[in-house]
A protein has these predicted regions:
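An exposed tryptophan-centered "aromatic clamp" motif
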Residues: 59-83, 88-141
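Extracellular adhesion/carbohydrate-recognition regions
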Residues: 1-83, 120-121, 150-165
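Carbohydrate-recognition loop of C-type lectin domains
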Residues: 143-150
Length: 165
């Protein structure tokens, strides 16, 4: 077996399963959140919720529109772990520790997380409140900012895994 992720959080969070998170070593290339607009896909719009796993499953299960992003993440599953698209809250955790995990990601042969603005925007699995049919949140690993974005735009994804003890 080879490494696929690096642990970046070992706390148990209220309302979240597991005992922390690990970030995948590599980005998923540009993917759209959804292949069409006008459909709420059943994800949370709560910016504080650690619900990326539930959100990604909701995206995958929506029959009225496909989620190329969720499908690409599900294609990663190996070694029994289940990767998913992080929520805004989970991306905030990763952002705060990115400078610490980057050397470990690189040692394992992965792509370091961006530390500056530029090519630093990643999809989250969190839809925008009251605009769920059209927009979801992007997260900047360069600045920690979030930006509402039409779901049909293609952006990078950095999956995470829940740690279960």
């Amino acid at each position: 077996k080879k490494a696929v992720a690096v642990v970046f959080d070992t706390r148990q969070h209220e309302g979240a399963e597991g005992n922390g998170y690990a970030v995948y070593l590599w980005d998923i290339t540009l993917q759209a959140f959804a292949d069409s607009l006008g459909i709420a896909q059943g994800t949370s719009a709560d910016l504080a919720a650690h619900d990326g796993n539930a959100n990604t499953f909701a995206l995958y299960e929506t029959k009225e529109t496909a989620s190329p992003m969720a499908e690409a993440v599900f294609d990663l599953w190996c070694y029994g772990q289940s990767a998913y698209v992080p929520s805004v809250a989970q991306m905030r955790l990763l952002y705060t520790i990115r400078e610490t995990v980057n050397p470990v990601i690189e040692q394992c042969g992965g792509d370091p997380l961006p530390l500056t603005d530029g090519d630093c925007w990643y999809w989250t699995s969190t839809e925008v409140a009251e605009q769920e049919t059209a927009k979801a949140w992007l997260y900047s690993m360069g600045s920690g900012a979030i930006q509402e974005t039409p779901k049909t735009q293609a952006h990078k994804v950095r999956p995470i895994i829940t740690i279960n003890r």
